[in-house]
């Protein structure tokens, strides 16, 4: 799906946009923003961001630098971490648990 959207936007950039002339009020242009959004966020969210951007690009709208927002960091709960930690093996675990710390006091 991303590939199809990519080529549709590229077709617009190469075939249609030169005939219309520069109209975008933002940097990067709306079509470049759409490409970056789709490649960064995937087809669904990237398309939503592109539509939202094109709707803001009008004579009474904003202008200037408007980059694609970075991909959000996915947070996981402590329960997910605990369940993943069950599968982690520690080398020499038995030796670590059976250390006699009184020998190190001298």
Swiss-Prot record:
Keywords carried by this UniProt record: Cell inner membrane, Cell membrane, Membrane
InterPro entries: Membr_insert_effic_factor_YidD
Topology of the protein relative to the lipid bilayer: Peripheral membrane protein
Keyword RNA-binding (UniProt): no
GO cellular component: plasma membrane
Main location: membrane
A UniProt-annotated Pfam family: YidD
Cellular compartments annotated: Cell inner membrane
Protein's job: Could be involved in insertion of integral membrane proteins into the membrane.
Alphabetized PANTHER family for the sequence: MEMBRANE PROTEIN INSERTION EFFICIENCY FACTOR-RELATED (PTHR33383:SF1)
Similarity comment: Belongs to the UPF0161 family.
Annotated protein name in UniProt: Putative membrane protein insertion efficiency factor
Organism: Acinetobacter baylyi (strain ATCC 33305 / BD413 / ADP1)
């Amino acid at each position: 799906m991303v590939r199809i959207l990519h080529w549709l936007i590229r077709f617009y950039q190469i075939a249609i946009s030169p005939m219309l002339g520069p109209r975008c009020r933002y940097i990067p242009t709306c079509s470049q923003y759409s490409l970056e959004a789709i490649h960064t966020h995937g087809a669904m969210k990237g398309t939503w961001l592109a539509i939202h951007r094109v709707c803001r690009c009008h004579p009474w709208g904003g202008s200037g630098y408007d980059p694609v927002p970075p991909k959000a960091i996915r947070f996981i709960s402590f329960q997910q971490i605990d369940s993943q930690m069950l599968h982690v093996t520690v080398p020499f675990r038995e030796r670590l648990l059976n250390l006699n710390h009184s020998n190190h006091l001298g």
